[in-house]
Amino acid sequence: QLRIVLENLLNNARRFSNDASKPIEVSITRREDQAVLSVRDYGVGIATEEQDMIFEPFYQIDKSRFRDSNHYGLGLNLCRTIIEAHDGNLRVESEEGSGSTFFLEIPMNLQSKD
């Protein structure tokens, strides 16, 4: 399940990046009893008023050149659902025009909840 989340975050970072010369940055750190994985892109960014809405089902940022009939606005909602099922948190920090960083925070004592 965590692989699904990471793949989705990386695919979104690649899709919304507008400068191929700037790499997508991925890091993992430990904070107390949590693992924190971050995915940073240098793409279009997300307006402050949309940052909570992007985790809602079917919500898509209206950036016309990124609209695609193969994307339905479910990926981030699915990611957040998976992470919260493991007592974690998925959040974003972003500035429009400067890219986004998604933070996946999960407990280090993660137990499988199959």
Report residues per predicted region.
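Acidic ATP/Mg2+-coordinating residue in the GHKL
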Residues: 41
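Short conserved segment of the HATPase_c
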Residues: 46-60
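Short alpha-helical Gxxx[C/S/T] motif in the catalytic ATP-binding
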Residues: 75, 79
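Conserved glycine-rich
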Residues: 87-88
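Glycine-rich GHKL/ HATPase_c ATP-binding element in histidine kinases
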Residues: 98-100
